[in-house]
């Protein structure tokens, strides 16, 4: 083969299968640079094949429901049950039947940059999106489990068109008779995964805003979870207006500072 390494690199970047004629031709090239390009291309194709297989797996519930006549299938997920501060946020998302997005997964398994990119794509292409936000004070009143259900219901109430079937991550919501709860649903359903991304990015941005309002707890990085910096902030500053007072160790920090007055 007479092409330079740079030309071969460019051509291999467009190859979509190892059966491609140019890929097969490159296999006969004994130059070390070409051998390395073949190896990297093979790894890229293997990764893409895995992503395609994962996407097909994550669309199985939606595909099966569509064949049963359901048209508007909503995925629902939440983020923020465990933090010591801030709201619990739920999202409900109805995707088009032909929606495909390689790399979509549980939001917690994605980098921030990847989540932000997918967030914008989902917002643009979804048929409908609802976001429910239950603040810290309501969490303290009703407990985090009930607050999560309220956030999910609030998100579903916003959907237009209304869903005719609901896929919920982990917890039975009892919002509709046509509903299915899936353990680890954000890794099994593309609709739930989309909802998890919307909820996660929405809440993370809220906590980054709160970090500027209430410095000293590192909210921009821990998102309200009980990290060492957050706990140090509680010990030295005390509680702030968005802390969940019913959660330990927030409750203890509040009592400690009250005892010093």
UniProtKB/Swiss-Prot annotation:
Gene3D superfamilies: Ribonuclease H-like superfamily/Ribonuclease H (3.30.420.10). SUPFAM superfamilies: Ribonuclease H-like (SSF53098). One of its GO terms (biological process) is mismatch repair. Its EC number is 3.1.26.4. A divalent metal cation binds at residues 77-78, 169. GO terms for cellular component: cytoplasm; ribonuclease H2 complex. Its main location: cytoplasm. Residues 71-259 form the RNase H type-2 domain. Belongs to the RNase HII family. PROSITE patterns: RNASE_H_2. Keywords: Cytoplasm, Endonuclease, Hydrolase, Manganese, Metal-binding, Nuclease. It comes from Listeria welshimeri serovar 6b (strain ATCC 35897 / DSM 20650 / CCUG 15529 / CIP 8149 / NCTC 11857 / SLCC 5334 / V8). Manganese or magnesium. Binds 1 divalent metal ion per monomer in the absence of substrate. May bind a second metal ion after substrate binding. It is an enzyme of class 3 (hydrolase). It catalyses: Endonucleolytic cleavage to 5'-phosphomonoester. GO terms for molecular function: manganese ion binding; RNA binding; RNA-DNA hybrid ribonuclease activity. Its cofactor is Mn(2+); Mg(2+). This is Ribonuclease HII. It is found in: Cytoplasm. The keyword Metal-binding applies. InterPro entries: RNase_HII, RNase_HII/HIII, RNase_HII/HIII_dom, RNaseH-like_sf, RNaseH_sf. Endonuclease that specifically degrades the RNA of RNA-DNA hybrids.
């Amino acid at each position: 083969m007479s092409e330079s390494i740079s030309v071969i690199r460019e051509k291999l970047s467009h190859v979509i299968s190892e059966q491609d004629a140019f890929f097969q031709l490159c296999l006969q090239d004994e130059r070390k640079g070409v051998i390395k390009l073949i190896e990297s291309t093979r790894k890229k194709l293997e990764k893409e094949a895995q992503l395609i297989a994962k996407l097909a797996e994550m669309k199985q519930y939606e595909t099966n429901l569509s064949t049963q006549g359901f048209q508007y299938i909503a995925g629902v997920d939440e983020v923020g049950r465990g933090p010591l501060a801030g709201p619990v946020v739920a999202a409900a998302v109805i995707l088009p039947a032909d929606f495909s997005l390689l790399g979509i997964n549980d939001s917690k398994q994605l980098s921030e940059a990847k989540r932000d990119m997918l967030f914008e794509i989902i917002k643009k292409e979804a048929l409908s999106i609802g976001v429910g936000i239950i603040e810290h004070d309501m969490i303290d009143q009703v407990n985090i489990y009930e607050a999560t259900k309220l956030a999910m219901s609030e998100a579903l109430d916003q959907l237009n068109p209304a869903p005719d079937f609901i896929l919920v991550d982990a917890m039975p919501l009892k919002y509709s008779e046509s509903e299915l709860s899936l353990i680890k649903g954000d890794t099994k359903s593309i609709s739930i995964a989309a909802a998890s991304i919307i909820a996660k990015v929405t809440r993370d941005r809220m906590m980054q805003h709160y970090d500027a309002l209430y410095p000293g707890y590192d909210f921009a990085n821990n998102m309200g979870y009980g990290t060492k910096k957050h706990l140090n902030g509680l010990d030295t500053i005390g509680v702030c207006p968005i802390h969940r007072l019913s959660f330990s160790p927030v409750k203890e920090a509040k009592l400690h500072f009250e005892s010093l007055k």
